[in-house]
Curated annotation (Swiss-Prot):
Name of a matching Pfam family: COX2_TM
Family of the protein in this entry: Belongs to the cytochrome c oxidase subunit 2 family.
Name of this chain's protein: Cytochrome c oxidase subunit 2
Keywords: Copper, Electron transport, Magnesium, Membrane, Metal-binding, Mitochondrion, Mitochondrion inner membrane, Respiratory chain, Translocase, Transmembrane, Transmembrane helix, Transport
InterPro entries, per database record: CcO_II, CcO_II-like_C, CcO_II_C, Copper_CuA, Cupredoxin, Cyt_c_oxidase_su2, Cyt_c_oxidase_su2_TM_dom, Cyt_c_oxidase_su2_TM_sf
Single Gene Ontology BP annotation: ATP synthesis coupled electron transport
Annotated source species: Macaca mulatta (Rhesus macaque)
A GO cellular-component term linked to this record: respiratory chain complex IV
Residues binding Mg(2+), per UniProt: 198
Membrane association type: Multi-pass membrane protein
Cofactor: Cu cation
Length: 227
């Protein structure tokens, strides 16, 4: 999870998040190069005596500043489109879990395990144990398997919410009357934190998400054993 004064992204826990980090570095290098070139042009203009201030036609310059930005945009767009395809791809998920947003808590339903349903509320500060994270702990974590494709069906019962876990590269809107889906494959066990990422009312900041990722063999014994 993130920590104070962290400048980089969180460590990836899914292939999609690894792709997002790579794309972030790719785009950052492109923006850094553009910023350097613009700064160099500005400094050159300020420090160089202009010898011709009445240029009315510069065909080569116009060609360069038209083609070069187009090439840069293409180089940024291609990996972005690939990631968009990966995030929307659904390849025969092994498990389906439904997440329903409320003001201001989440409800989870394990449709593959007899319709197991439970609510997940933020723990008040008085109920926290030593080492627990303030405003991020919940009474019931959503338990998910690793190394298996999981489909999350996400919706809302009242207003707009957004189910988000950064380390998994997940952010899917929960829209009333609409069922959105996202598929992911976690790569390592652990406890990972997220929050509702859509302003949903007075207690929007008190709507955390905690996912506990466990080995597939343990999960197949039944998620109720880990709740």
């Amino acid at each position: 999870m993130a920590h104070p004064v962290q400048l980089s992204l969180q460590d990836a826990t899914s292939p999609v998040m690894e792709e997002l980090i790579t794309f972030h570095d790719h785009a950052f290098m492109a923006m850094s190069l553009i910023s350097f070139l613009v700064l160099y042009a500005l400094l050159s203009t300020l420090t160089t005596k202009l010898t011709n201030t009445s240029i009315t036609d510069a065909q080569e310059m116009e060609t360069i500043w038209t083609i070069l930005p187009a090439i840069i945009l293409i180089l940024i767009a291609l990996p972005s489109l690939r990631i968009l395809y990966l995030t929307d791809e659904v390849n025969d998920p092994s498990f389906t879990i439904k997440s329903i947003g409320h003001q201001w808590y989440w409800t989870y339903e394990y449709t593959d395990y007899g319709g197991l349903i439970f609510n997940s509320y933020m723990l008040p500060p008085l109920f926290l144990n030593p080492g627990d994270l303030r405003l991020l702990e919940v009474d019931n974590r959503v338990v998910l398997p690793i190394e298996a494709p999981v489909r999350m069906m996400i919706t809302s019962q009242d207003v707009l919410h957004s189910w988000t876990i950064p380390t998994l590269g997940l952010k899917t809107d929960a829209v009333p009357g609409r069922l959105n889906q996202t598929v992911f494959t976690a790569t390592r066990p652990g406890v990972y934190y997220g929050q509702c990422s859509e302003i949903c009312g007075a207690n929007h900041s008190f709507m955390p998400i905690v996912a506990e990722l466990i080995p597939l063999k343990i999960f197949e014994m039944g998620p109720v054993l880990t709740l």
